[in-house]
């Protein structure tokens, strides 16, 4: 994605919180745990604060974790990738794979920017 230029200017996501609205994120994933933000996370399907995906026999609910890694994966940890905004706080709202609703979350969580793309 050619982000090195932004990184060279000191842009790293510091001071920004990003929330992924998807099938959940693995909050304890080694690439995400350092930047995990519980205040930007919830599970609307089970009505609790744990954004971890529901894994079944197909093991298919990993999309949110992958998206979160592309945004805020920790650099230099001997794992796979570095996130584009590697110093951003990352949260997840587990809303897919169950009941879907989004409109009240912007107000409830006092977020200035709210975007949701669900295909």
Sequence positions of predicted segments:
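Active-site core segment of subtilase-fold serine proteases
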Residues: 1-119
